[in-house]
From Swiss-Prot:
Site feature: Interaction with m3G-cap structure: S106, K145, W278
Organism lineage string: Eukaryota, Metazoa, Chordata, Craniata, Vertebrata
Chain positions covered by the region annotation Necessary for binding to the m3G-cap structure: 210-329
Feature: compositional bias, Basic and acidic residues: 315-341
Identification of the protein by name: Snurportin-1
Ranges where the record places region Necessary for interaction with KPNB1 and m3G-cap U1 and U5 snRNP import receptor activity: 1-65
């Protein structure tokens, strides 16, 4: 999957990834340059075909994540790692390999699918930090997108505490967005439930399963001693114009960050994929051509017209910034947690320092 994505990548990219959500949408009204968006629909088609024939061993993959047991992995990988460490004179701590890049990430929704209303589902996402949740052997671990374990705690997820972890097979792996304000892990997707992997299942089935099983776990949505963080499933909606208008006029129990558009047939594939699209709510009208109701979600922020210029300027010093952050992290044990999208500006729109990578 990764090789195919790289082979099909076009020249547009302010970051290293094609249509990365770390950069602004190429079709913001103030910047209607003709970027290469035709490939996005073609890459969607090819990825859907590829996943029909490509069946990875996700049973063992999920087990390794749950048990942190990598026995049997290629010995050459370890030798390569050892050689790299011997050649590396930089004392900065390397990123962990095992739990990094395990989440399925989106691209900006540039090329609007012709079957958007029939074959796509939209999820309203809260402001927060993406987290890989692994509940296994009586403990629950939270990992960043980069693979750092930032918290371990008990939870009422299957396998997440000593009381309900009856067997080693009772493990759960979730894709979540953590809201520090609400002390809540909003469940975006499910990769494994009670030892049963769902990587090869279609999005509509994964969402159905997730929203059916989460309410069955009594107390999971409450903050208690044994469950110090709430786990709440995010709802999904059809992508018809009528549904989108209704969604954008709703009130949500969290601050809304943006919208994720999932193709119904998408399997859960770690890494960026054009089969998951990302838009900020105020972009729906311009990008999708849908008449939206006036309201807080659809009001364009002041920085919308300056976002592209800010990102470009910010990227010039990105490598230096990353080196400083990594060095600082290795010294004090704190690591940069990556946002789902561009955080709100805390300074005037013309300041390039106010934007961070997602």
């Amino acid at each position: 999957m990764e090789e195919l994505s790289q082979a099909l990548a076009s020249s547009f990219s302010v970051s290293q990834e094609l249509n990365s959500t770390a950069a602004p949408h190429p079709r913001l009204s103030q910047y209607k340059s003709k970027y290469s968006s035709l490939e996005q629909s073609e890459r969607r088609r090819q990825l859907l075909e590829l996943q029909k024939s490509k069946r990875l061993d996700y049973v063992n993959h999920a087990r390794r994540l749950a048990e942190d047991d990598w026995t049997g992995m290629e010995s050459g990988e370890e030798e390569k790692k050892k050689d790299e460490e011997e050649m590396d004179l930089d004392p900065v701590k390397k990123l962990p390999k095992r739990y990094a890049n395990q989440l399925m990430l989106s691209e900006w929704l540039i090329d609007v699918p012709s079957d958007l209303g029939q074959e796509w589902i939209v999820v309203v996402c809260p402001v927060g930090k993406r987290a890989l949740i692994v509940a296994s052997r009586g403990s629950t671990s939270a990992y960043t997108k980069s693979g750092y374990c930032v918290n371990r705690f008990s939870s009422l997820l299957p396998g997440g505490n000593r009381r309900n972890s009856t067997t080693a097979k009772d493990y759960t792996i979730l894709d979540c967005i953590y809201s520090e304000v609400n002390q809540t892990y909003y469940v975006l997707d499910v990769m494994c439930w009670r030892g049963h992997p769902f990587y090869d299942c279609q999005t509509d089935f994964r969402f159905y399963w997730m929203n059916s099983k989460l309410p069955e776990e009594e107390g999971l949505g409450e903050k208690t001693k044994i469950n110090p963080f709430k786990f709440v499933g995010l709802k999904n909606f059809p992508c018809t114009p009528e549904s989108l208008c209704k969604v954008l006029s709703m009130d949500f129990p969290f601050e809304v960050d943006g919208l994720l558009f999932y193709h119904k047939q998408t399997h859960y594939s770690p890494g960026s994929t054009p089969l998951v699209g990302w838009l900020r709510p105020y972009m729906v009208s311009d990008i999708l051509g849908v008449a939206v109701p006036a309201g807080p979600l659809t009001t364009k922020p002041e920085y919308a017209g300056h976002q592209l210029q800010q990102i470009i300027e910010h990227k010039r010093s990105q490598e230096d910034t990353k080196e400083k952050l990594t060095h600082k992290a290795s010294e004090n044990g704190h690591y940069e947690l990556e946002h789902l999208s561009t955080p709100k500006l805390r300074s005037p729109p013309h300041s390039s320092e106010s934007l961070m990578d997602s």
